[in-house]
């Protein structure tokens, strides 16, 4: 029998060799120049890079505006180490402050650094996994690289369940919901049934290759077409769904948008980069003012009847917008950028200014 990979040992090996030089970090920032153009950094301004990754956007911002200051947040310890290394370099010393945590950790970090609400000049979100996370097999995000089925964006820094834990314990009905809600998977029932059968009859699913191979067998093939008619592995949506569930990504995105409204000053600028419709829908509804009780409304505005609401507070929250979008149509990479960096092909950028 093939010996299964040891996730703990591989994770320790990854941590030991994770001292990557920030100048050669394997990440090409998406829509970088456009993002910085919309942020419009000014001397003395304070900015938050909410998803530091390998630091491409932060580097460009600080190069464009040497007298600005950036707080660099990331939940990934490797990204945090890259931010620390960058902050200690002569070029960026005193201008870059690394922060380790999720979006929901920001209020605590804000207090620790003596920052006030309504004081920040700009915030940038580059949602989803970083290239570093996809490229490191030991992180468990990649279909094409075999590794332990982990998928935790924080690398286990704060504990939490792994993707393998989810698949070992989730009920079939709940797995169907996860695949439909977070992966927009039309074959959710078929895949969930097959995964539970494999779990019950064979073994605990512990590696990315095992999961990808099982789904390939369930779907009678390894590829199919995505929404844009591009070839995609039949396990792509399942990987996305489980990753989003493990990391509580959509709730974190929603909370990040709420925090942006609290932290930015009036006329402060927000730039977001999303990579699939679930992320973009949350961002779009916040910017359009379609928010109820601090959360993106489940219904688009065109399906919401304001005339049926008699609660003044709720009506005000629906009609009072906090953002003005800075462009008419969503911004996507041009053909040249997609050719240079294929991972940018599904990116969407939105930029807005805080109005109240």
Curated annotation (Swiss-Prot):
S-adenosyl-L-methionine binds at residues 55-57, 74, 103, 126, 133. The keyword Cytoplasm does not apply. The keyword Methyltransferase applies. One of its GO terms (molecular function) is rRNA (cytosine-N4-)-methyltransferase activity. Its EC number is 2.1.1.-. GO terms for cellular component: mitochondrial matrix. NCBIfam families: 16S rRNA (cytosine(1402)-N(4))-methyltransferase RsmH. Probable S-adenosyl-L-methionine-dependent methyltransferase. This is Probable methyltransferase-like protein 15 homolog. It comes from Drosophila melanogaster (Fruit fly).
